[in-house]
Every structure is written in C-alpha cells, then in structure tokens.
Amino acid sequence: MRLPSLLSFLFASTTLAALPYKGVDWSSLLIEEKAGKTYKNSAGTVQPLETILKSSGVNTVRQRIWVNPSDANYNLDYNIKLAKRAKAAGLKIYLDFHYSDNWADPGKQVTPAAWKSLAKDALVKQVYDYTKSVMGTFQSNGISLDIVSIGNEITPGLLFPVGKLGSGEGAANVAALLKSASRAIKESSISPKPKIMIHLDNGWKWDTQMWWYDTVLATGALSLADFDMQGVSYYPFYNAAATLAAFGTSVANMAKKYGKEVVVAETNWPSYCPNPSTAFPADTKSIPISVDGQVQWMKEVAKRVTAVGGGKGTGVFYWEPAWIDNAGLGSSCGWNLMFGDDGKVMSSLAVFNSI
C-alpha cells in the first residue's frame, strides 16, 4: 500500500471510530447565569457556554426536565429556552425526563405532586399525555431532539410507588409506564423522531443491567422495539468495584444481548479530591486526580464505548462540567468541573475533540 493510501486508510479508520454523540449535561446553565456567572474560553475571553462547548468538540447537550418544580427551574419553559440556544449553536439535544418535580435517581423516584393520587392505569395515561405534550411543544418551537430518555437512572423503577420494582406488580407497571412514554414519543408531532433511551445507573454492573432488562422485558408489556438506546451512568468514586474492565465488559455484553446502542449518559472525573469517601477502582489508579486525569479518564471510557461490537457504542456525556456553584457534583470530591471558579474553561474540556 502506498503511503498516501495508507494515510487515507488510517484517517478513515480514526474518523469511523469517533463517537456520534460527544456531550455534556448543561442543565444548570440558566441558573448559573442568573446568579451572575460567566464563562471564558482558554484565552480568558467571555463567551456563551455553548460557544465554548462547540469549539471544544462537544456536539450534543443533555437537559433534564422536571414536571412542576416549585421554582420553575428545569421545567418545560426552562428547557425550551435552553434548547433554543443549543439549536442556534448547532448542538444536538438529548432531553432527559425525570418524571418528577425534583431529582429522580436510584435513591428516589417521587411521583409528581399533581399525579400522586393516580392509580396505575390513570398514571400510564398521564405519562403518555405529558410526554406527548412536551414533544409537541418542542416541535411547535422548531426544535428537534436527537435523544429522549424516558426516566433518569430508573434502576429501582420510576414513579413510586406504582412503578417500584420488587413490589407486587412493579415490573409490569414499570414496563407499562415506559411503553406509554415510548408510544407517546412515536405518536407525537415531533419530527424527525428522536432515539428513545432507557437509562440505568451502575453501568459497570453487568448482572444488574441484565437483571433489569430481563425482568422488565419478561412482563411482555415492553419490547425491544420500544427503545433504541441503553444509557448508563458510570462514575469512578462511588464503588471500588467500578473498574474500567468491568465497565467495558458490561457495555459490550449489553449491546451483544439486546442489540441496542449503548451510551454513557453520565460520567465525571475529579481534578481535586483530597478525601474520597470510597476508594477508586484499582485499574484507575494510574489516572491522576487532575485536569490531565480528566482527559485520560474520558479517553479510557470512550475507548471502551467505541470498542463495543457492531458500532453500537455511540456516546459519552460528561455530567454538568460547568456547574460552578456545585463543583463536587454530589460526590465526595471537591472539583469535578471542567471550568474554574472564575468561569474559565480548563484544558480538559477539549478532550471532546479527540474522542
């Protein structure tokens, strides 16, 4: 093979390996700006966050949506305002339904206050109506969505107590609720149709992922045709068993067994963590707790996602790299952001140009 041909081949191979979805969660942006925060590029020039993200290689932004939050933060209007900025910047949008008035995660999946009295069938209909309405609002505002997650980290279920796994009809109810959400998206006015994601935590635990999908799919109320993506959260600072090796095995197994795209919906790495509450996984010990370490971590995670068979590993999302007022991002580490407290971007954000 002649050198130009070899170089062309190598370039093509590299291009093919790039992730289709290289993203960050930027949900907190409007709150931060209201508090007076500004963002600066590497030269120290103030720019809109979306401009800095785009120039750093980010192509998709993730946004959480809550049903009726008491302060209106993360509600539908908030998300439309934020999404308009993403669209103007040429960024794709991944909308993350929490189906709650506040945070929904493995520790809590609280049914919205206005829905609390609904029995199962009425709740299933409410999820359909709400989801379809949200899709219609995005469509009427001329905003397309690339990904929609029907629930956030729903490993224990969603919309408790009706959709709580491990309780009576829990699995069948979870399946019915998710089926309803999926059908609402497919039957909504939004066009083109977004990819539908189911998102669980602990992406490194293959046995948990398999148990969840096998349990819910076995009810017959939800089928593989109802979703396109399996999203996972994968953090290094909550469990020493969360090794890169375990993560790589888990996502590979997921794609092989279920045939869906696999996406890391959330991840972080700290640049400062003097007193972690949990030991970091053994095979991450060579990655420094630093800005350079953030780059190494993202490359290691992306490498395992792109290695998933059949090109099924399609995305990695860094959770809230610009939330200056919440630098620990819920962990025991002091700084997980990719921006300094002065709003200046750290060099680590540019890793999105190389994954």
Where are these regions (language model features)?
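Aromatic-rich peripheral "rim/lid" segments of glycoside hydrolase catalytic domains that contact
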Residues: 34-40, 44-45, 253, 272-355
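Short, acidic/polar
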Residues: 36-54, 79, 127-137, 206-220, ...
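N-terminal substrate-binding region of glycoside hydrolase catalytic domains
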Residues: 19-92, 98-127, 231, 237
